[in-house]
Amino acid sequence: MLFNFDLENIKVVLGLIAGIIAFLAYIIYVISILRGKTKPNRATWWIWAFMGLVVGLSYYASGAQNTIWVPFIEFIGPLSIALLSIKYGEGGLDNKTDLICLFGAILSVILWIIFDNPVIALVSSLVVDSFAIVPTIKKSYLRPEGEDFWAWFGTGIADSLNMFAVEKFIFAILVYPIYMLVSDLIIIFVLLLRKKGIMKDISFLGKHD
């Protein structure tokens, strides 16, 4: 047969599709930023860019293959948005939450160096990443108009598919896609809760200037 669609091949394809959807979600987010509808938090996205590199490398070193595309995009995407946040974003290292994020990022690198273990590095990186998401969750609740729902919805789909692309059901491989999916669902839920009229916008996705 020309194509051998066994379970492993399907997982490879799902991982690739998840990466493509994640990439498209970031494109939506970038467009929203350039149109002035979304104002990314500088602290969050710079830390995410840095942690995206750390997580991607440690996740790959932990044995991930099929699911590596999303972590790769989770470095490229946040780096692009972090650069845009210099001009179009808001916030910075001007409050306790942001300072905790910075301290956590530094601590993660130190732990990686001390233990020289990719799994420990991965877990510590995800803990730091969870600190970095706090400013965005807070902003999503206080000012939901400052976040793009459909971009987050797209990343939620990507991370859901990535769950099915997992090649080995072991902690080192499962922890990243589970963490990412939970993070996406929290922000999606907050945005749905705060954006009362979000369902009315479905028919007008391309209508905004």
Can you name each region flagged by the protein language model?
Residues 2-209:
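Alpha-helical membrane-protein topology signature
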